[in-house]
Amino acid sequence: MMDSPKKLGYHMPAEYEPHHGTLMIWPTRPGSWPFQGKAAKRAFTQIIETIAEGERVYLLVEQAYLSEAQSYLGDKVVYLDIPTNDAWARDTGPTILVNDKGKKLAVDWAFNAWGGTYDGLYQDYEEDDQVASRFAEALERPVYDAKPFVLEGGAIHSDGQGTILVTESCLLSPGRNPNLTKEEIENTLLESLGAEKVIWLPYGIYQDETNEHVDNVVAFVGPAEVVLAWTDDENDPQYAMSKADLELLEQETDAKGCHFTIHKLPIPAVRQVVTEEDLPGYIYEEGEEERYAGERLAASYVNFYIANKAVLVPQFEDVNDQVALDILSKCFPDRKVVGIPARDILLGGGNIHCITQQIPE
């Protein structure tokens, strides 16, 4: 049994620190990506091309889809033939830590499709549960086996200086680690991520089927500086959730004792929902969560990804699209802030941050 990453001197860098590259997975699951994923593949391509301007992109794609992926992307990415059950690289990929000497360590969490038999979204997740270790092996990185502790990358944010953000709704959900107390979960995070403090936000985004991942509601944009998904509509269930998160953040400090600067990032003004036209496009496996017309999707501009040269921000053909771009442009003056039409990723159940996983420099 190897010592914990914390004891070995490793920590999780912030996403805005320099990257070696980004991990992504080609979207092919018929129950996630409607109509053969055609629209999703166009969106993924735009994201990959934008990220690739400033860093390497590793794309997991099985042999059967390789020529298709190459027809979209050519030689812009490093293709790896690693099997997956879906395309959520944030949640199935490794969390890569660094130490003071620049050495890297890949943390391999247990993955059970956001809740296993309790409330998981699909039951065939064996390949997904192996993605982190197989990808680390391909990169020739050592692996810290955190199993059987269940965690997804979208459930944690790090400031790179000892602070981890999580949501109670996700980490304390009965489908993750029901046998562990909150204190035990926190201790596992501190030891596995080389951190000093965990901040527990009460909620994420309303109707987020990951049990409300933190990466959809709050994100670090710098040390002691965050953006928070927000609405002023008191009739929207999101209002009370964001308000509770705001109140907690206002009284909290980071691991260094600093109070947070909090930027409110509006959610889209018009609710994003599944339409009747979307439904025929999905083909489900047994035991897979099914979409319904009128289902509210967890749309949030906070699900952006910070690449070396760009910040990629979801866009929903909404009046708040530009508002979000303007706020984030002020937060990231040294990067190009790029809006990406993202409804076709949202239809899969996540957004830009959910399909990317940074590999620190």
Swiss-Prot record:
Q: What is its EC number?
A: 3.5.3.12
The record, for InterPro entries, names: Agmatine_deiminase (IPR017754), Peptidyl-Arg-deiminase_porph (IPR007466)
- List, from the UniProt record, the residues annotated as the active site of this protein: 354
Which GO BP terms, alphabetically? putrescine biosynthetic process
Which Pfam families does this UniProt record tie to the protein?
PAD_porph (PF04371)
Molecular function (Gene Ontology), one example:
agmatine deiminase activity
> What chemistry does it catalyse, as a reaction equation?
agmatine + H2O = N-carbamoylputrescine + NH4(+)
From what superkingdom does this record's organism come?
Bacteria
Presence of keyword Hydrolase: yes
In terms of HAMAP family, this protein maps to: Agmatine_deimin
Protein name as annotated:
Putative agmatine deiminase
Q: From which organism does this entry originate?
A: Streptococcus pneumoniae (strain CGSP14)
